[in-house]
Structure formats: C-alpha cells, structure tokens
C-alpha cells in the first residue's frame, strides 16, 4: 500500500475506525472474503480503515479495533491536542500497537506510551484498566484512540464434547457466518448438513437465528449435545433429511460430507 493511499485513508473523516487483521497465508482468501462482506473492501495490508463500527470479537481475523480520536503527522501534535482538549480517563492504560508498517523502535514505543499517559487527565491502571488506549504509527501518520481487542472467547467452542476430524474448522465456520450474512442479523440461516454443529454454534454465538439438520441420528444427537453444552436449545438441531425441509430461510451454509454416505 502506497504512502499516498494511506494518507488518503487517514485523511478521510468518514473513517472513524482502524482495524488490524491477522491471518495465515492459507487463510488469506477466506479473510479477504470476510472483510469484503463486513466492510465492502479487501485490505491490501494487515489493516483497514472504515466508517463501520464492528466488534472485533465477531471475527476470527480482526485482532483489534481502534476508535480513532486523532490522526496526525507527529506524536507531538497528538500530545498537544490531548493537553489542549483535556482528554480524561480514569483507570486507563496506553498501549503501543505494532502495525508492521513503518513501525518505530522499542525505545520510541515506550517513550510514546509514557508521554501520552503523562498528559491524559486521570489515573492509570496498568493491571486492571477500565479503558485501553492505543497509539499506532502507519507510515508517516500517527493514530490515537480507544482500543478494543478481540477477546477470543469464541475459541472455547473448540472444547465442545463431540468433535470429528472431518468437521469444518472453528475459524472457518465463524468466518463463513460473517461472509454469508454480511453482518445482517435480520437474516435466518439453515445448515442442512450440520454435522456436530460447528457452524450452528458460531451463528448462535453471533446472535443469528439458525436451524441445523443432520441426516445421521447419532451425529445429530452429538450436535444437540454440543449446542446444549454452550447453553443453547438442543431442539435447534433436527435429525432428518435436508430434502424434507419445508421452511424458507434467507441463507444456507452447506458443507456437504463428501464420501461419508
């Protein structure tokens, strides 16, 4: 990404949020599809700017979000603005977030955190902060704002009672729900070959109305046990043939079990 393009994005007042993305090379295409569905853009680097407010914990690939307060040419300008505008937080913590794009030395990262923390009105709390703040350098721009991290609580879904080696991976399942729905929570979803319920669990966790069908009675029972384990109604899973589905749904997420039946 060129410096000119980054400067254009930083200067766009509609871009209120900065998102940092982390995915493996094997996941890149899946990640790009998810970003396009959520933000209507494909990132050229490990970050993107957007005017869409999106909880990073809803995505397997967004590491953190910054609610942008300032984007400036230098750290000194940001420090002066904090002082002049009397920015105030109680129980706060300042973090330097590495961008891997025009980053600064370890010593200068510590200096930036220290100097910003010193001019904010209020008392810091390094160990149990109520508010986390971020300072980031992207090429020749400095970004300051409120930091929201992905809490990765959804990873506990890997600990479901029943799993199969041929089941869809958790990260992929979560991304597929976001890709299929474009973050529109009004949509209803059907997974007609739900297996042990991996996609169903992610959709439920993201707040969607979803139903699962599984033709194998033993596997359907395991899927019911899995979703009940995480506090959901086991009746969401039906043991039956997809050809007998009569209800209408907005979205179908289908992972056909090739070679198993």
Tell where the protein language model's regions lie, with residue ranges.
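Short loop/turn segments at strand-loop or loop-helix junctions that form parts
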Residues: 95-99, 147, 254-257
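A positively charged, amphipathic N-terminal helix/segment that binds anionic biomolecules
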Residues: 98-101, 133-136, 178-183
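Short acidic low-complexity segments
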Residues: 122-129, 240-245
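SAM-dependent Rossmann-like transferase core, predominantly class I methyltransferases
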Residues: 141-183
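Conserved S-adenosyl-L-methionine
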Residues: 168-246
